[in-house]
A protein has these predicted regions:
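Sec-dependent signal peptide recognition
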Residues: 2-8
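C-terminal motif of bacterial Sec signal peptides marking the signal peptidase cleavage site
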Residues: 13-15
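C-terminal His-loop and adjacent cap/lid subdomain of alpha/beta-hydrolase
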Residues: 17-358
């Protein structure tokens, strides 16, 4: 209820007040640099919170990852980026609070609460003998920067307390994570990069850097409820100015045309599986991206028609305004009787039968 009210207020207070975007931030990509390269060692088959001292959540405290190593070792990694809204100014960050954890200090207890959801969904259930993920190392990247995991900026939004800063450091945090994760899993052969909502956007926008960091592994992408469409009106300018997002340098058009990222990834990484899960008229994305009524439906249809024509780019799309499909991983069934679980498993295993569902 609180999130729904915040989203309603977001629409009412901001739809007509988009400032003109400032200068374009420079794109950036490549292998991560800086930070520790020490491997992470934690007990197998249990979740451990691993803070990284050089990283920052929104309030300036350390960010980190949750790690659940496979028993007996593995050359497979499931890397999941968490979602939880976004914020880009004083109203969204501190009044409406439309992004999770930007004022929180992340802890082991919070990690356990969040990863329990993944197990309940079925993604990290090691007891499911049908799961292609059951013997993989699990890595969970919490979301505490409000920037779709791709920001590289520190902002002072509180004019009454100018010393209060918000760290939109999702991209630089990911740099640090990748350095140590590569050292922890140097022999990885398969990496599944997944995310829901804000995490789905982070997964898509970070795919190039993850693939470069794990250059010896096959990296495949699954973005849930994260249609890579352009926000409406001036909203993308507001977000871009706040976050200074880290965009792949190979995608020269991405700063002004986000769907072009999929074209770039499909060309740069041929044969990699690029999957999308979506509700075609997602109401949550409609509000965050400032679309008029029905606008997300048209934007989604355009994305599917123009970007998901590449070899190995596929979608599982349901009609409606709901948000997040992976919560129904074990129960959702799409057109033609195709279950979401079977579709995701086909994506994960490279099944030639993997195809569009709508």
């Amino acid at each position: 209820m609180r999130r729904a009210l915040a989203l309603l207020l977001l629409t009412l207070t901001m739809a007509c007040t988009a400032p003109a975007p400032g200068p374009l931030p420079g794109p950036d990509a490549g292998t991560p640099d800086g930070g520790s390269t020490e491997p992470i060692s934690t007990p197998a088959s249990q979740w451990t919170w691993v803070p990284f001292p050089e990283t920052r959540c929104g309030n300036g405290t350390p960010a980190g990852v949750g790690l659940n190593p496979a028993p007996g070792g593995s050359r497979k990694v499931l890397l999941f980026l968490a979602g939880g809204g976004a914020c880009w100014d004083p109203v969204t960050c501190y009044v409406l609070k439309t992004a999770v954890h930007v004022e929180d200090t992340y802890t082991q207890a919070l990690l356990e609460t969040e990863v329990a959801q993944l197990t309940a969904w079925g993604l990290t259930d090691r007891q499911d003998e049908t799961s292609p993920f059951r013997d993989a190392h699990f890595v969970y990247v919490p979301y505490c920067t409000g920037d779709l995991h791709v920001g590289d900026a520190v902002r002072s939004y509180d004019s009454t307390h100018p010393q209060r800063q918000l760290h939109h450091r999702g991209a630089s945090n990911m740099d640090a994570f990748l350095l140590r994760l590569k050292a922890t899993f140097p022999d990885a052969e398969q990496l599944w990069l997944m995310g829901s909502s804000a995490g789905g956007y982070g997964a898509q926008l970070s795919f190039d850097r993850v693939s470069l960091a794990f250059s010896g592994a096959r990296v495949d992408l699954l973005a849930d409820s994260a249609q890579l469409v352009m926000p409406y009106g001036g909203r993308w300018g507001e977000m871009r100015n706040a976050w200074n997002p880290r965009l792949p340098s190979e995608c020269t058009e991405c700063a002004q045309d986000l769907p072009k990222l999929l074209d770039t990834l499909a060309t740069r990484w041929p044969g990699r599986r690029l999957g999308l899960l979506a509700y075609d008229n997602d109401a949550t994305l409609t509000l965050y991206f400032n679309y008029p009524l029905g606008g997300m439906l048209g934007a989604t249809q355009s994305l599917l028609a123009n970007q998901y024509t590449h070899d190995r780019a596929r979608y599982f799309v349901l009609g409606g305004t709901d948000h997040v499909l992976l919560s129904g991983y074990k129960s959702l069934v799409g057109p033609g009787g195709v279950s979401l679980k079977s579709w995701v498993q086909q994506w994960a295993t490279g099944d030639p039968a993997w195809s569009n569902v709508r």
